[in-house]
Amino acid sequence: AASDVYKRQAQDVKTLREMTNVGMMDCKKALQATDGDMDAAVDWLREKGLAKAAKKADRVAAEGVAYAAVVNGIGVVIEVNSETDFAAKTDAFMDLVKNLATVVATENPADVDALKACKYPGSNLTVTEIMQEKVMSIGENMQIRRFARFADNTSVAYVHAGGTHGVLVNLAVEGGIDATEIGKNVAMQIAAMSPKYWDKSQVPQADVDKELAVQVALMDNDPKMASKPAAVKEKIAAGKMAAFYKESCLLQQEFVRSDLYKGDVAGYIADAAKKLGGSVKFVDAVRFQTGEGIEKKQEDFAAEVAAQMNMGK
């Protein structure tokens, strides 16, 4: 229906505005110019000089918990979704999540289906059967969404704000030092800053080219810049690319705990390890944000209240 299309378009304009802090009319123009492609619309606004680099809209809607733990030296991060925030905060739900993390660590299942077929700790039942029981007792649907596991090197787990983020950091540690605090601080950085890449050497060439094209278009569309020599533009673009790496790559990001170290994350890791008398190398990490990428059905708030009042009759 036309009204549904209009609602969807209005929602897209709202989302783009939240991502870019650009006015509604310009957001509408950007979406019209790019046939509703959100990423292309962000680039269109940037090329016109209307928007700075926008973070992807965190379309976080599903409730649940992102949990990380180290079990017998094996790092695990897992996301389990529920229908309401209330259920996710119950002891029964958290016990389930912790036990699932233990199963991932000990059984090394290949995927979510394999995890569901595993035996549940302290029971003869499978994970699926236990979850069916929990659904009955808690009174709402629950889903294991995803998990990741590190068996090598040293893993450090961090859970932020009661399970909104679960981060697992994997480090290569030498010199017999305890790198737990280093790992926790790096994990907190990842939770807070959501880097797109770990190191600038890992940024795909296509992404580098795309960012460079945006910067060049931005200068070409600026009357003050358009007439400047190509060499000057190249120098400015190089400076913009350095800023791009600093914003989007973990090891090049400014370390948020400036009370501990002033400089980038790579510098913090090296400095902290040296103070402990050893060396630490960042290997890998996984960041789960609860409900990331899951779109929840948009309900009209007034209709929702009315529906609840009718239910109470």
Where does each model-flagged region fall?
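Short, small-residue-biased leader/transition segments that mark boundaries at the very start
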Residues: A1-Y6
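N-terminal assembly/interaction segments in proteins that build large macromolecular machines
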Residues: K7-K313
